[in-house]
Amino acid sequence: MYVDILLLAELTSGPKYGYEIKKNIQNRLGENFELNHNMLYPSLRRFENMGAITKKVHTQVGKPNRNMYDITETGEEIFSEMLREFPEKLATNNIEFLVRIALFEKLDYEERKEVLTIRQDILHKQLTAIQSLDANSFFITEVIDFSKSRIEHELLWITSLMKKI
């Protein structure tokens, strides 16, 4: 779902070519937010079929045609709904969470707080589960300690974000 959110978010700032959408996302968020052609173009076609975006074909002499995509009012509504929707299943996914944080400017205070609270609850559950594990070897203990540390660090970050929203 994060690919759809990023794609529509990119179009909220104006019409763009597919390649431009891909490059802008990677330039802003880095390579951790994978968006390859096999993800981008099927999503663009699906959104076009839904009426969420429009496509204008720009003919080029001696070159392949280029498609310019723009978001519609329906697309804006779909984008807002997708961004706000953050069920527990999605909240366990790091990228889904980080994409929503990156787009916090598009959410109001209550929506931001809800995203952070849902993720915080998930992390507390994960921490409880990890703490109950039986570490029967040195390396398992290392993995458990690393996982606890990562979760605790993210919980501190969420606490910090709560003060900034």
Task: Annotate the PLM regions.
Residues 113, 120, 124-127, 134, ...:
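Heptad-repeat amphipathic alpha-helical coiled-coil interaction surface used
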Residues 165:
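Inter-helical turn/loop segments and adjacent helix faces that build the functional surface
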